[in-house]
Design a protein with these regions (language model features):
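Alpha/beta-hydrolase fold nucleophile elbow
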Residues: 312-325
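C-terminal, loop-rich substrate-recognition/catalytic regions characterized by aromatic stacking residues
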Residues: 399-403, 496-766
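Short beta-strand/loop motif that positions the catalytic acidic residue
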Residues: 445, 451-453
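Conserved alpha/beta-hydrolase "acid-adjacent" motif
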Residues: 458-464
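Accessory cap/linker subdomain of secreted extracellular hydrolases
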Residues: 146-197, 203, 208-211, 271, ...
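N-terminal cap/lid segment of alpha/beta-hydrolase-fold proteins
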Residues: 203-245, 630-632
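Cap/lid segment of the alpha/beta-hydrolase catalytic domain
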Residues: 240-309, 494-506, 651, 657, ...
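A catalytic-pocket lid/entrance helix-loop region that shapes and gates access to the active site
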Residues: 321, 328-392, 455, 474-520
Length: 766
């Protein structure tokens, strides 16, 4: 049912490759491209057939050669290596228009193209050709350029198996059809080009990159640092060989103990004139302890910071950076206030107990297997993370069986003590509060902070939680926000990692930024007296989708000129949808939803929609409210809020409100959403059950901001859903702990009434 939780988790974890192949024009898409069926299972036949396919696609191109990203791949597969080099050189020299321009990092393909040209033209074997190409292209780079290039030249262990699976998937249609359409053929060429390039270079590159590193840097791996309570954390330390005796240090502290990534992070900081340090959670890398997510990272990161400050190469100043879990570790360390910690740059930062592993008190499904991936051993269990069939099967079985949520480990057959521990803390209680700054602890945090996140980042709630609490308890805080149409990946790495489109939305040129480059602009400002990054013109810096501009405001509230109320109508139209009203309906009028929580007839349902821009919406188990068309263009910027007057026959229910712009062309544009368990709307630290049959008022403010220029003639649409799906907990409304409820607690169908006094308040500007 619904979209696979596996797909959502891959996006969150950054497993998908950026979508490089753009849609073909209708004329081109009508062409067909034949390959022998045997090529799907015979590598030699595939290698023999692919050059001709690439040449045919090049001959049929309709872009006049302007799509260099597509063109160089076709040229590589066609064997025209000199032309591929020219395309790659032109593409690498390009830059986006945004305030922190993105420059494509294609060093791995430039290296491969040069090596193949040398091999072909000079009769060298590939090892010799690759070594010479490396000397010509990489050895000659300055440290900063090489530090960026090394991020794509140091392959992770999971890269090649992942590419092999992608190639197999692209080949699968050949077993059942005689020809591919242009889009499928382009996708096949891309998968083939990536897999063959990496497979050729993977055995040879480690020695080349290690020699280059040894020439440029002093590198210490697996440095064991003792913590005050007797545990061990592991560090990787990189310093330029020609660096000053003492420098500020940039620390990335992570549970993701991948040796390639940890070195890449530390090396890039060193290449920018800092001591680069990557620390890993206790129990990871060289630490002999047992890994435990979240609980010790604040103390351990603070201990590592104290250790760094005492080293002869440290000038006593440490900055922290990183995204997702690595954003959490920054705030966890700041809670302990180590003296040497002077600045933060947290990106797409989760807040344990608030938006991870649950949101609004509702536990997410995709978080179930994350601890098996991240804390199952000293490294990472990529096989568990990428076993989508296993997790889809587990959740389907759970959904159909109606068993309690806490029995997921029994259904899967593998213990998951961390997830069960989290389930035992559904309130935002002392367990969670001990992890990150809480309330007036923010008042003591006098260090400068730059937060980055995205409108479509699953961790935006956490990122904005830290920002809002910092402002609340320390109004003078030097804390900046950069936010735009970014995902969990692009919100920490920039759009170079994901491309110029996101889930069907073509990004404005101004939205395309390099957050890695912004990182060093930020720390150079803090530590080296450089100018403040130009993008940080005010505290809140946001990209207005559809307007191709950045705007700047002193607060989240100041993003909009006014707040307009949209009241829930009570009478459904002929299409089953309700109107948004300018004034409240009669107080006793209501729109009612009836949901049988025992029903599983939708277990195989294919969910419509899913794009940021999409012709369809998923309206199952939902009431849909639609406004009148806007007479003129409106800008929706900021956080929406609402007051819900509700009644139900249960003691609790889970709900979601998703907002869309219904554009004049009848497509929907995803704006923002809010999700919560009704009993936690007022206070996430204490569950307050509802009284069946009695009207209740729920006041909320969403945690996800957005900014979109809505067209004249557009309408605002709200999809208000009562939640029942296999992707997260099901709240049966009995009032028992939800993790212990089963379908036996469902009783009669749930009835939820949205009374006429209910409204959403939208931040708007003309």
């Amino acid at each position: 049912m619904l979209r696979s939780i596996w797909g959502a988790a891959l996006v969150a974890a950054g497993v998908f490759w950026a979508a490089d192949v753009r849609a073909a024009t209708p004329a081109a898409a009508s062409a067909s491209y034949a390959l022998p069926a045997a090529a799907a299972d015979d590598a030699a036949r595939l290698d023999a057939a692919m050059p001709a396919l690439a040449r045919q696609l090049l001959a049929d191109a309709r872009d006049d050669g302007r799509d260099l990203n597509q063109r160089f791949r076709l040229q590589l597969v066609a064997g025209d290596y000199a032309a591929a080099e020219r395309s790659l050189e032109a593409l690498s020299a390009s830059a986006t228009q945004g305030p922190v321009p993105v420059r494509p990092n294609l060093a791995q393909y430039r290296l491969y193209a040069r090596a193949k040209r040398l091999q072909t033209q000079q009769g060298l074997d590939f090892d010799q050709a690759l070594s010479r190409a490396f000397a010509e292209l990489v050895t000659t780079m300055d440290d900063r350029s090489a530090g960026v290039a090394m991020r794509v030249l140091n392959f992770e262990a999971a890269d090649l198996p992942r590419q092999q699976r992608a190639l197999a998937a692209a080949l699968a249609p050949l077993r059942t059809q005689a020809a591919l359409d242009r889009d499928a053929a382009l996708a096949l060429v891309r998968s083939y080009q990536v897999e063959r390039s990496y497979a050729a270079m993977a055995p040879r590159l480690p020695a080349l990159t290690a020699a280059d590193d040894a020439r440029r840097y002093a590198i210490q791996r697996d440095v064991a640092v003792a913590t005050p309570d007797g545990a061990t954390v592991c560090a990787t330390i990189v310093r330029q060989r020609n660096a000053p005796q003492r420098q500020p240090t940039l620390l990335n502290f992570t549970i993701y103990a991948d040796p390639v990534t940890t070195l890449n992070e530390a090396r890039r900081s060193a290449s920018n004139g800092y001591v680069g340090v990557t620390g890993t959670s206790r129990g990871k890398a060289c630490s002999p302890d047992r890994p435990v997510p979240y609980e010790h990272d604040g103390d351990d990161a603070a201990a590592l910071i104290d250790w760094i400050a005492a080293q002869p190469w440290s000038d006593g100043r440490v900055g922290m950076y990183g995204g997702s879990y690595e954003g959490f570790t920054q705030w966890a360390a700041a809670k302990r206030r180590p003296k040497a910690l002077k600045a933060l740059m947290p990106s797409v930062t989760g807040a344990p107990g608030l938006d991870v592993p649950m949101e609004g008190g509702i536990f997410y499904g995709f978080q179930y297997y994350w601890p098996l991936y991240s804390a199952g051993n000293r490294g990472l269990d990529t096989a568990a993370m990428e076993d989508g069939a296993r997790w889809d099967r587990m959740y389907r079985q759970w959904y159909l069986s109606g068993r309690p949520y806490r029995e997921l480990p029994q259904i899967d057959g593998t213990p998951n003590p961390f997830y069960l521990r989290w389930l035992s803390h559904p309130d935002y209680d002392a367990y969670w509060q001990a992890m990150i700054p809480y309330r007036d602890e923010f008042a003591a945090l006098d260090l400068p902070v730059l937060t980055t996140t995205g409108y479509y980042d699953g961790a935006q709630i956490g990122a904005l939680y830290y920002l809002r609490e910092h402002y609340l308890y320390r109004p003078q805080a030097e804390h900046y926000l950069v936010i735009g149409p970014y995902s969990h990946i692009s919100g920490q790495r920039g759009t170079g990692a994901t491309g110029d489109s996101l889930r069907g939305y073509q990004l404005d040129p101004q939205a395309q930024i390099d957050i890695g480059e912004l990182r060093y602009q930020w720390f150079d400002y803090v530590f080296k007296g450089a100018p403040k990054p130009a993008l940080l013109a005010d505290r809140i810096n946001y990209q207005v989708m559809g307007a191709n501009v950045w705007k700047h405001a002193p607060s989240l509230a100041a993003m909009a000129q006014r707040r307009q109320r949209f009241y829930f109508g009570a009478q459904a139209g002929g299409d089953g949808r309700y109107a948004f009203l300018a004034r409240a309906a009669a107080s006793d009028d209501y729109a009612e939803q009836v949901v049988d929580l025992r029903d599983r007839s939708d277990a195989e349902r294919i969910v419509p929609g899913g794009g940021i821009v999409d012709p369809e919406l998923d309206t199952a188990l939902s009431a849909v409210f639609v406004s009148e068309p806007f007479a003129r263009a409106q800008e929706f910027s900021g956080l929406f809020s609402g007051q819900l007057e509700v009644g139900t026959n249960k003691r609790d229910f889970d709900f979601n409100i998703s907002l869309y712009e219904l554009m004049p062309d009848r497509r929907y544009f995803e704006l923002s959403r809010y999700q919560s368990r009704a009993s936690y709307v007022d206070d996430v630290s204490r569950r307050r059950l509802l009284e069946p049959g009695r009207r209740t008022v729920l006041n909320f403010e969403a945690g996800r901001a957005t900014s979109k220029r809505m067209q004249a003639g557009s309408r605002l649409v709200a999809v208000v859903s009562v939640l029942r799906n296999p992707q997260q907990q099901i709240n049966y409304g009995s009032g028992k702990p939800v993790a212990a409820e089963s379908v036996a607690d469902a009783g009669e169908p749930m009835r939820v009434r949205w009374y006429g006094g209910s409204y959403l308040e939208i931040p708007l500007s003309d």
